């Protein structure tokens, strides 16, 4: 959308099902990263209404259905800095479409 990214090499992109319709800010377009298989992967192009794309060129083992961490340790703080805001504002903006998994002592409780 809008041709906001210019790729300098052959690139493999993954499409993530989260976008500004879910409360993931458009201001993170071409700026933020997500985590896949323990590796930070840059967002490429604009965050769309229901999706965003990330560069997984250097992760040949990534497959459809793999888990991507959008907000997590280090990532949420980084995104807040990029948006000139606080972590709580980002988390409060997430829509009900985004499932919540609550942890107690590192284990999911709901």
Where are these regions (language model features)?
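Active-site anion/phosphate-binding pocket segments in diverse small-molecule metabolic enzymes
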Residues: 1-110
